[in-house]
Amino acid sequence: YETLNSMKNIQSSSRKRVQACGFTLIELLVVIAIIAILAAMLLPALSKAKSKAQGIKCMSNLRQLTLGWIMYAGDNGERLAPNGNRVNTPAGMLATDSSFQSGGANAQWCPGRMDTGTSPYDDSFIKAGLVYPNVNTTAIYHCPADQSIYPPGTSFGKPRVRSISMNCWLNPITSWNASQGYTGAQALKIFRKTSDFSVPGPTMTFVFIDENPNTIDDAFIVFDPNQNNFWPNVPAS
């Protein structure tokens, strides 16, 4: 009888210990609330770190493109790669003006538009450009932070292959004139060769820039240095 009572006491004591080790509903809610607070504190920091990493990668892409652009000039008598908005096909573009590399197909730094046809998601247009042989990768033509698709606002859109554009005053194929809305266009500085970078100097002139997905079209970004409010194309934010 005493042995039986002892066993009952042991079982009762064990059940009490098991019950004592459990969490109450309030304790579980407190733990969940703490986890939620910690997540809310960490997520902005993680998002900021991701944005910073994307910015660093984008700057690296611009640097590589600029080096490829400089190499092109070095191989072509210091003439800058033609820059413009010629026909939207990888082949058949000609630039016969003496200021450009005369003749030859695909005579511009990067053909194709990001707002029409198949070129927004076809990297063969990038590969047909004059700078590509010096960089040999299409990835650097696109900023990792750019999540835009074409056609925009659709469920079947595809990521654009390019978000980078070139300064429109660096050996433009299209001739600027006053009728296009550029104030004092004839007096604006157009750079044809590396030796033209005198005023302003190279450190005051940008070559490539990440363009806003709402305005990106051809591969050059159009702006008027004489008018602060005249930006047909807008840099990415």
Predicted regions and their residues:
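N-terminal leader/signal peptides at the extreme start of proteins
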Residues: 1-25
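Compositionally biased amphipathic helical and low-complexity segments enriched in hydrophobic
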Residues: 5, 12, 26-30, 44, ...
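Short amphipathic alpha-helical "recognition" segments used for binding
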Residues: 6, 12-15, 31, 54-56, ...
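Compositionally biased regions
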Residues: 7, 13-15, 48, 164, ...
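Coiled-coil-like amphipathic alpha-helices with heptad-repeat character
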Residues: 10-12, 47, 137, 157
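Generic hydrophobic-segment detector
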Residues: 12, 26, 30, 39, ...
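Amphipathic alpha-helical segments typified by the pilin-like N-terminal helix
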Residues: 18-60
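Short, well-structured segments within or immediately adjacent to enzyme catalytic domains
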Residues: 58-237
